[in-house]
Amino acid sequence: KVSYEQKPFRREVMRTYGATVTPSPSMETEVGKRILEKHPGTSGSLGCAISEAVEKATTTEGYRYVLGSVLNHVLLHQTIIGLEAEKQMEMAGDYPTKVIACFGGGSNFAGITFPFLRHNLTAGKTTEFIAAEPACCPKLSQGKMMYDFGDTAGTTPLIPMLSLGSDFQPEQIHAAGLRYHGGGQIVSQLVQDGYINSVAIPQDETFKAGILFARAE
């Protein structure tokens, strides 16, 4: 819901291509109604949206739902990003000492870091990997390792992950795609094993850093 309200041009692009766009949680699904009853006034979360999407897909003939982050096959698919970055570094004759990426559920972070991280595991490299997560949703920094659901309503299979709890309702921030309660299972295990560090950053600090970077560049 927060993205629906904050980013009107995105929904207009979708509507241009014929989509019907509904903010989540909504009154259009049973799970949406339950979430709104339990959390009146909530701005929603990725977990809420997943629950509603799963219900819609499973109750509409001919439709399937595919999770776009968190799960291992998604994280590994995204590594094309890091493989390209690795090749670019090779062409430049350099190699990173640190790799930093934002972290919501893990697909973006895994995509850029995993190709480099394998060299720490197999070739003795000492690159540092830092997951930057929002302070309002610090699943890697403060979450507990558990088997948890990937959505608010508990419709997905249980997933081993660092999690704040599938019922966690994060506060409203601009980067709505990072407002997810858990981390992908491979990333969660690598955090537990000490291969990945995490840092939880407040939104205001992020904006200040973005402005500094833009002006310095």
Where would I find each of the regions flagged by the language model?
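Short glycine/serine/threonine-rich phosphate/pyrophosphate-binding segments
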Residues: 5-8, 102-113, 139-141
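Buried hydrophobic positions in well-ordered alpha/beta secondary-structure cores of metabolic enzymes
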Residues: 14, 53, 85, 99-101, ...
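A glycine-rich, Thr/Ser-enriched phosphate-binding loop motif common to dinucleotide/cofactor-binding enzymes
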Residues: 69-84
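Active-site/ligand-binding loops adjacent to catalytic centers
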Residues: 34-73, 93, 118-121, 126, ...
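Alpha-helical scaffold elements adjacent to nucleotide-binding pockets in ATP/GTP-utilizing enzyme cores
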Residues: 9-13, 84, 115
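Active-site-proximal loop->helix
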Residues: 1-43, 139-152
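Short helix-loop-beta connector
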Residues: 91-97
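Short Gly/Thr/Asp-enriched flexible loops that form oxyanion-binding sites at enzyme active sites
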Residues: 85, 109-119
